[in-house]
Amino acid sequence: MLILSRKVNEGIVIDDNIHIKVISIDRGSVRLGFEAPESTLILRTELKEAIVSENQKASASVDESLLENIKKVIKP
């Protein structure tokens, strides 16, 4: 992991097309601004983790009887 120190109004550039700028620092909270192509997905970590968790729950809740019926229909 690369760790950088930046002050307000300073920034970093990733791959020449993603710009991240420190907008403000206030009582333990940092506001960041992002400039990136529209095709670049930018998510907060907690949102990404929630999506992964929901996807895992959805895939784990497969009805076993449904799978057995599918196996009966599709025979090798």
UniProtKB/Swiss-Prot annotation:
RNA-binding among keywords: yes
Family according to the record: Belongs to the CsrA/RsmA family.
Taxonomic lineage from the root: Bacteria, Pseudomonadati, Campylobacterota, Epsilonproteobacteria, Campylobacterales
SUPFAM superfamilies cross-referenced by the UniProt entry: CsrA-like
Function: A translational regulator that binds mRNA to regulate translation initiation and/or mRNA stability. Usually binds in the 5'-UTR at or near the Shine-Dalgarno sequence preventing ribosome-binding, thus repressing translation. Its main target seems to be the major flagellin gene, while its function is anatagonized by FliW.
Subcellular location(s) of the protein: Cytoplasm
Keyword annotations: Bacterial flagellum biogenesis, Cytoplasm, Repressor, RNA-binding, Translation regulation
Name of this protein: Translational regulator CsrA
Any GO MF annotation of the entry: mRNA 5'-UTR binding
Subunit structure, as described in the record: Homodimer; the beta-strands of each monomer intercalate to form a hydrophobic core, while the alpha-helices form wings that extend away from the core.
NCBIfam families, per the entry: csrA, PRK00568.1
HAMAP family: CsrA
InterPro entries registered for this protein in UniProt: CsrA, CsrA_sf
Membrane-traversing stretches: none
BP terms from Gene Ontology: bacterial-type flagellum organization; mRNA catabolic process; negative regulation of translational initiation; regulation of bacterial-type flagellum assembly; regulation of carbohydrate metabolic process
Organism: Helicobacter pylori (strain J99 / ATCC 700824) (Campylobacter pylori J99)
GO CC terms in record: cytosol
